[in-house]
Design a protein with these regions (language model features):
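A short alpha-helix capping/helix-coil boundary motif
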Residues: 1, 43-46, 140-143, 147
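Catalytic helix-loop patch of NAD(P)-dependent Rossmann-fold dehydrogenases
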Residues: 1-40, 49-60
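Active-site pre-Tyr helix/loop in NAD(P)-dependent dehydrogenases
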Residues: 1-3, 9, 41-44, 81, ...
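Short acidic, glycine/proline-rich loop/turn micro-motifs
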Residues: 46-50, 89-90
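C-terminal substrate-binding subdomain of Rossmann-fold SDR/epimerase-dehydratase oxidoreductases
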Residues: 61-191
Length: 191
């Protein structure tokens, strides 16, 4: 329904995989195929036992932020502060991994032959600085950061048009950005 374009090899790979599915007659007629387009999955299981532990230097905001909290890195690098956003930093749609799991369950219960594509996100965007402030507020921790030049390939704003999944699968995210920040921090402290 929306034109797809990639800003990176990773993004192009995702598009190529979708195109391979769409071009195979088996997926169109003989089975129920659901493509879930994730936006920015973050957070951790609420018991703090399962979460993300990146290898090497993370490229995503939350793992890098947690690396700063855990003294792996001296400060958080904020790439770009001159975007046309609420505070000049990039905006993304962050979805709690537990909400993502719920979306998978809803999709598995969809029993329709053919291919369905759903955007899985909250439909709301938060800037890098809004995430930092939410993390600081909910966890009572100050995050040292420095503004850096923009990264090549980063887009200004990206969030899900999630109307289709809301309507068709009756799915909606339940956890807000504060819960995401709390659960991610809890996991990082246990691991």
């Amino acid at each position: 329904e929306h034109p797809l374009s990639a800003m990176s090899p990773y993004g192009q790979n995702k598009i190529d995989i979708e195109q391979a599915i769409f071009s195979d007659p088996f997926f169109k007629t003989d089975c129920c195929t659901t493509v879930l387009r994730y936006f920015n999955p973050v957070g951790a299981f609420q018991d703090g036992l399962i979460g993300e532990i990146p290898r090497g230097i993370p490229n995503n905001l939350m793992p890098y932020l947690l690396g700063v909290v855990n003294k792996v890195y001296p400060f958080l690098q904020v790439f770009g502060h001159d975007y046309k956003t609420v505070d000049g930093t990039p905006v993304r749609d962050y979805i709690h991994i537990m909400d993502l799991i719920d979306a998978h369950y809803q999709a598995l219960n969809e029993n329709k032959t053919g291919i369905e594509v759903f955007n899985v996100g909250t439909g709301e965007g938060y800037s890098v600085m809004q995430i930092i402030k939410a993390f600081e507020q909910v966890n009572k921790i100050k995050i040292p950061f420095k503004y850096m030049p923009r990264r090549e390939g980063d887009v200004e704003t990206c969030f899900a048009d999630n109307k289709k999944i809301l309507k068709r699968l009756n799915w909606k995210s339940k956890r807000d950005i504060y819960q995401i920040c709390f659960d991610a921090f809890k996991f990082s402290q246990k691991n």
